[in-house]
Amino acid sequence: PLVKATDLHQPVDPAKLLTHVIYRNQDDFLSLLSGYADEAYQHGIFPSVMMAQAILESGSDGSSQLALESKNLFGMKGHYKGQSQEWSTFEDEGGQQYYDIQDVFRHYDSYHDSIMDYLAKLGTEDRYKQVPLAQTPQEQVHLIHEAGYATDDAYTEKLIDLMETYNLYQYN
C-alpha cells in the first residue's frame, strides 16, 4: 500500500534511530553490507560498488529516513511485493541543477530484502545487462549510472570517491 511519508532529507530523530535500527554506527553498517559480499559476486556486482551505493543512498551509517522507515538502503524507486512509500527527493536535471519531487520508493520488511532486491535488479534486469560484465568497480559504477540508476550527473564520481574514502575495495 502507498503511504505518504515525511521529507527524505530531514534529519532523523536519534531516539527513533535507536528503536528502529540495529546498525547504529558506520562500522556496524559496513559489517552488515560486507556480509553480503558473496551474494554480490554471485549477481556479478562488486561488493565495493554495492557498499558505496548503500552509503550514498542511506548515509555512512544507514540512518537516512528512507533506510529507517522503509528499510530501503539503495534509494530504489517503485514497488516491492506491492509495498511502497512516497517520499520527497531531489533529481538532477543536468549540470547538477537539482529540483524536488515526490516519488514512490520501494518499502521492504528487512534490510536483507532490500539488499537481495538491489542485487537481483542489477544482476538480471535488461537495462543493467552490461553491469555484471564490468571488469573493475569503476567501470561498474559508470555502467550503473549510464543505465539510468540515478539522475545525478556526479553519481559515478561520488561512488568512486566513497569507495576510496572508506577503502571499500578491500571487500572485493
Each PLM stretch: what is its role?
Residues 1-172:
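Catalytic cores of secreted/periplasmic lytic hydrolases that degrade extracellular macromolecules
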